[in-house]
Amino acid sequence: VSSSRPLVRLDRRSFLVALGAVPVAAALASCNGNDSASKPPAGPDLSGMDRAVRPQDDLFRHVNGTWLRTYQLPPDKTSFGTFTEVSDRVEGQLKDVIAGIVDPKDGTPEQQIRDLYDARMDEATLDKLGLTPLSGLFAQIDGAATKPDLAKVMGALPLGGLIGLGITVDQKNSNAYLPSIGQSGLGMSEQYYSKPQFAQYLAAYSTLLGKLAAGGGLPDPNGSAQRVLDLEKQIAAAFWDNVRTRDSDATYNLKSWDEVKALAPEFDWEPWLSGSTDRPKELFAKIVVAEPSFVTSAGRIWAATDIAIWRDYLKLALLRSYAKYMTKALSDANFEYVKVTAGVQQRPELWKSAVGVVDGNLGEVLGKLYVAKYFPAEAKDRAKQLVDNLLAAYRQNFRNSSWMSPPTRDAAIAKLGKITVKIGYPDKWVDYSKVKVTRGKLVESLLAITAFEAKRSMNKLGTPVDKTEWGMTPQTVNAYYDVTSNSINFPAAILQAPFFDKDAEAAVNYGAIGAVIGHEIGHGFDDQGSKYDGDGNRKDWWTPQDQAAFDAKTKQLIAQYDVLVPEGLPPTDHVNGALTVGENLADLRGLMISLAAFRIDLKTDKPNYTDMFLAWGRNWREKQTTQYTESLLANDVHSPSEFRCNQVVRNLPEFYQTFGVKEGDKLFLAQDQRVSL
């Protein structure tokens, strides 16, 4: 159960290149960019602008229209935009750093990085090894004679399994870790198994399972694939939808171990837990159950399904996870599925996949090498200035709020004062020295890393929460708010142009990185984050009247987004306002507060906001395949980029003042329909 709120969706499909690396320190600057005396501050990037589109009608296409019309999406990408522009730029730096590692000493971080990279690059060896890397795990599955035996094996496998087990921070005691269980066990989004609009995805998945079963040596491959697909359909039917799973009230169900077992008495809990971890049983005396009704259904499905089908299910889950790193036939089968579900036409270059493997599995090891070279410690202080200005603007907003009563205002300001700001990279790094990465053995090395991470996670039980730990690597082009540590986190990689530029005018930095910072702070006060106090604990600090007022604003914003349909899609493919409301609230607050911080910085109540809004529009430049857009609409808690730009500004008086927006303009929103926070 994650408590983190990233700025953009992180779990991009695995065939895409992992996000970026860290920029040079020179990309950082004070918020007003006045430290460059040799040339005037740079304005917003207008190279993609379409002046035929009025900002009053469509700010997103006014800023990006020419680029959207002329840019051709590369055949190996599902999307490209400002975030991928930055990540592509720094991805090459990751490659260069890895290439600079020559004959590293055995057991060093450099050896781990280089050998993992080289193992991914050696496709001939991967093809030659065939199924050998998984043979030991297959033998364990086949050796399980009974369901209790198989439950123990399932717990030990590097998979989510039927019921997922993880470690989370206790929402009611943010200094303690708790084990958590919840829904798991699918190869696709649960919606793809039943909704008619995803029928082609289901067909492609069925084909993939058949090819994996054949390539994996399963007897009766087509029959095995169909039986596993039917099983996954049953599991998917028990899933909570993604609106319900983001409700932190509904997903916090603290149970004793006996109560957990009583939820699903048919499931073999004891052997499953012993396979999952060797930690003492008493550490599992209390467990958070995220989706209790799913657990109950999972127990029934476990009992009703023949053990032979479960064996095939686990084998196909392993093959699905590692197919792209095995024989050419299995890798090709995996990519054929990706082509259908994501709309890409060709694979990325092999080196990009290899960089992604290193970044995705040894990201902190790689990140430490990067920040040592490109991001000196003093750079944190320079970025902190802008954060401080945003916090000051938030404080002013709460103090002057017309809809919050004094007790709620005071509590909000108190929480704001306790926010921890983390910039660039962690102060201490995870020690991966005990992980064995073996040259020429990619899958075995990945299994070793996965086992290490699982053990590291389980070892947190019984220890105080480490609130200095990061949930992203420094080379990640993103940012996030963590609710149980009440922290905002800005990896080094996002602190560069076009998000943050030392040579840019203040308006540009406030419209770009300023709004990003405001967004992350805003998550502490969105529909879910507002349920926690400054120490990261669940606490109701709102008066009933203020809570009702906030709920009304939230419902109003949900209604605004529910009617939005991305360009080129049918009317039925509209934004899910309830799913995206947390991010929409953070987007709205983020830009609203950044506008206020801009005023504070310039010491005027009436600055020229034009360049700030243009920079805001540039933030959300993005082009996607239709398949990827459809997938995100169904699954992502973020709205499509065009609405993250346009719908936010429709609620802001500064936008109306700056561009003279009036009734009849397409972005005009009646005063009584606007949401003010």
Predicted region positions:
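Noncatalytic, helix-rich "gating/capping" subdomain that lines the substrate-entry/channel surface
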Residues: 99-389
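Active-site-surrounding "flap" and adjacent substrate/cofactor-binding loops of secreted or lumenal enzymes
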Residues: 40, 54-57, 62-117
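Short, Gly/Pro- and small/polar-rich lid/capping loops
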Residues: 38-47
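N-terminal secretory signal peptides
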Residues: 1-10, 17-28
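Hydrophobic/aromatic-rich, well-ordered segments within soluble, folded domains that form packed cores
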Residues: 48-69, 192-213, 581, 588-593
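Intrinsically disordered, low-complexity linker/terminal regions across diverse proteins
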Residues: 87, 266, 288, 292, ...
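Short, solvent-exposed loop/turn elements at domain surfaces
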Residues: 67-71, 188, 498
